[in-house]
């Protein structure tokens, strides 16, 4: 795969290519997991820099050991807090041309790691996708939570956002973070294996028109449940929608708006780069949310207590990492409200215990 990738450098006139762990929605549950395809690294955070004659993998302190085990044969491993990509690039006499997918980076994240020691070349057609068609499509539809279970209606949340726009004199706002769309519309889905956050984005205008971008078949269950005029579009229609919107300015989120979308919006509107106000709105929990958090903590605590009792009274010589992981989830499944684990269980025995975010598999599985 790496050699095939490097063969494309000449066509695009680049000296290297960047592959982050995240996907277009900045999710750690990347679909496709391009970083794993290239490097075999399976951790939740990381980034590869592929140059013509050398390959680098940057991870945080949790994953240095895991990265060496999974990717050390073909990659030079660096802890990103100690060595950044721009430090590697600064050693070259002439600035290298480094290609990247603008859908996978914000301006903030790219500049922090790479500038000023290279020339960045945006390539819209992802080079890994050209070599490997791996995206798994999820056919399950979105669903909306009952406002009684979350403590606030969608109408109320949208009104709060409209009031914010009015005070800040914002004509249009782009909510690019799926978790904020999820909060704003009380929306959930099945796009990610360990999270109910649906992959979607939205635009809200000061005239209260809402444009929701997602696969159209996924929104069939919610079309008539959002108390506002909603226009549903595929993501490929984004530029078409931008051109029909009115107003002079657009607010985008500096944390989650990719370079790709920022460029499309800036072709017609003056951009205000701010932090999405939904981050602030949702950080203040209402009484129902607080009660539900407490209830969830107690219910999960019951499952964990039963698990600890079980393991204390078991013959540990007969147990291994996978059996322990399965048993813990079985206790959690007894709760009628249980959906799935929020992250993979970390059950490491012996040397596996030194791998901070270890996940057992048939090959690595050890006795307890």
Residue ranges, per PLM feature:
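Conserved catalytic alpha/beta cores of large enzymes that bind or transform nucleotide phosphates
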Residues: 223-277
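Ligand-binding face of N-terminal immunoglobulin V-set domains in extracellular IgSF glycoproteins
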Residues: 98
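Acidic, metal-coordinating catalytic cores used for nucleic-acid/nucleotide bond scission
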Residues: 104-106, 256-257
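Short secondary-structure boundary segments
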Residues: 21, 102, 254
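Loop/turn positions that initiate beta-strands
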Residues: 366-368
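N-terminal accessory/capping or targeting/presequence segment of soluble
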Residues: 1-93, 105, 109-244, 299, ...
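Terminal amphipathic helices with adjacent charged low-complexity linkers/tails
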Residues: 116-135, 257-292
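Long, K/E/R/D-enriched contiguous segments that form extended
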Residues: 280-346, 350-351
